[in-house]
Structure formats: structure tokens, C-alpha cells
Swiss-Prot record:
GO cellular component: extracellular region
Name of this protein: Antimicrobial peptide TsAP-2
Coiled-coil regions listed: none
Organism in which the protein naturally occurs: Tityus serrulatus (Brazilian scorpion)
Tissue expression per record: Expressed by the venom gland.
Function: Antimicrobial peptide. Has a high antibacterial activity against the Gram-positive bacterium S.aureus (MIC=5-17.30 uM), the methicillin-resistant S.aureus (MRSA) (MIC=17.30 uM), and E.faecalis (MIC=69.23 uM). Has antifungal activity against Candida spp. and one Cryptococcus neoformans strains with MICs values ranging from 6.25 to 100 uM. Also shows an inhibitory activity on C.albicans biofilms at high concentrations. Has a moderate hemolytic potency (18% at 20 uM).
UniProt keyword annotations, A-Z: Amidation, Antibiotic, Antimicrobial, Cytolysis, Fungicide, Hemolysis, Secreted, Signal
Modified residues (Lysine amide): 39
Transmembrane segments: none
Gene Ontology biological-process entries: defense response to bacterium; defense response to fungus; killing of cells of another organism
pH-activity profile: Stable to pH variation.
């Protein structure tokens, strides 16, 4: 075999092995995501994020109100 064929096959095997390794590494995360979706954890996380966003908006409005009431120097 010529060297260019060997290099081509080597890179092809390297790419396939890398993709298989990445796929096998993704499987535990996918399983964990499915389990948490079935248990409803994601819904609770979204609810807490909405509350944090509302609190942030409230604090931001209070800060704007405070800055508007400060005298200009």
C-alpha cells in the first residue's frame, strides 16, 4: 500500500473512534436528562428561575427609582 492510503485510513479510523468516544460520553448525560424530565425536576428549576428573574426586575426597578430620586451633582 502507498503511504497516502495508509495515512487516509489512519485519519478515517481516528475520526470514527473520536465520534464513537464522544457519543459514548454523551449517553450518561442524556439518560440523566431523561430521568430528570420524567421526575419533573426541570419544571421546578424553571419555576425558581422565573422567581429569580422577577426578583431581579423588582430590584432593578427599585434601583432606578432610587437613582431617579437622588439629586444631580
Amino acid at each position: 500500500m502507498q503511504i497516502k492510503h495508509l495515512i487516509t485510513i489512519f485519519f478515517l479510523v481516528l475520526i470514527v473512534a473520536d465520534h464513537c468516544h464522544a457519543f459514548l460520553g454523551m449517553i450518561p448525560g442524556l439518560i440523566g436528562g431523561l430521568i430528570s424530565a420524567f421526575k419533573g425536576r426541570r419544571k421546578r428549576e424553571i419555576t425558581s428561575q422565573i422567581e429569580q428573574y422577577r426578583n431581579l426586575q423588582k430590584r432593578e426597578a427599585e434601583l432606578e427609582n432610587l437613582l431617579a430620586n437622588l439629586p444631580v451633582y
